[in-house]
Amino acid sequence: MNNFFFRPVAPQSASPYSVRVPTRFTVLGSGSAGNASFLETDQTRLLIDAGLSGRQIRLRLAQMGRSPETLDGILLTHEHTDHTQGLKALCAKLEIPVYCNRLTADELRFRMETKLDVRQFVTGQSFEIGDVTVENFSVPHDAQDPVGFHVRTADGGVGVLTDLGQATRLVLERVRGVSALFIEANYDLNLLQEDTRRPWAIKQRIMSRHGHLANSSTAEAVENLANGTLRNIVLGHLSRDCNTPEIAKEAVAEKLLQAGIDSLRIDVSTQANPTETITL
């Protein structure tokens, strides 16, 4: 049984606010068990991935005085459970549009019984939701058709790069010019190699081009993007066993220091709590 509504992506009606709200971005939680972030502009409120439980997403939005009922859409990077497990709870009663590409939608259709209002986009083609333009682009990862996002707003851009094995030149160019970047820093190479609980085959997958970013690779990517409009970095998707917030932040900060760059704010997202909100 097909429980999906398929509609072409189109601009959504604006949500009226009495006072203009500057663009704000918060990572609600990020890690191996679940990932979700929240972006709010003057007219639009978006959830980017829904990998936390529906209850946790609701609780963490409530901390900011928001609720799922006010969302204008949910953007999905890919179909893996740590990015989608909250969809069922959020969409069971609320008709929140879910934006994803065809292969991601196809995969979700086989796994979910909940009826979803899917707004299918074509990978590589931008679209609008309210007052934002969403650019999406392919990233290397072991999913059906994983993407990153560059969300353009009146106040600047927000880039989302989670779950990718390599920050290619093409990927970096797609987020160049953002004001804030949420980027994966999954593992410390030494800790992963010394981990006795993971089979070598799993380690190879993690370190592969379609796996996850090491701290050192993340640091190089951030250095590459640092000369320009970039002001805020949020490191995410840290491994519970092969990384720590301190190690990840130090790796990026040291790389920037060596390059003589000291103008960036670096935050690290965790599974347990939202990050401090970034205002563009």
Language-model segment annotations:
Residues 48-51, 71-79, 99-102, 159-162, ...:
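Active-site neighborhood of phospho(di)ester-bond hydrolases with catalytic His/Asp-centered motifs
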Residues 169-270:
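Cap/insert and terminal regions of metallo-dependent hydrolase folds
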Residues 101-156:
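Metallo-beta-lactamase
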Residues 33, 81-84, 105-107, 143-144, ...:
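Active-site environment of divalent metal-dependent phosphoester hydrolases
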Residues 29-30, 50-52, 79, 139-142, ...:
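Active-site metal-binding loops of divalent metal-dependent hydrolases
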Residues 2-9, 13-18, 246-280:
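C-terminal regulatory/interaction regions
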Residues 4-6, 12-64, 147-163, 180:
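Conserved beta-strand hairpin/beta-sheet module of binuclear metal-dependent hydrolase folds
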Residues 54-100, 179:
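Active-site metal-binding motif and surrounding structural segment of the metallo-beta-lactamase
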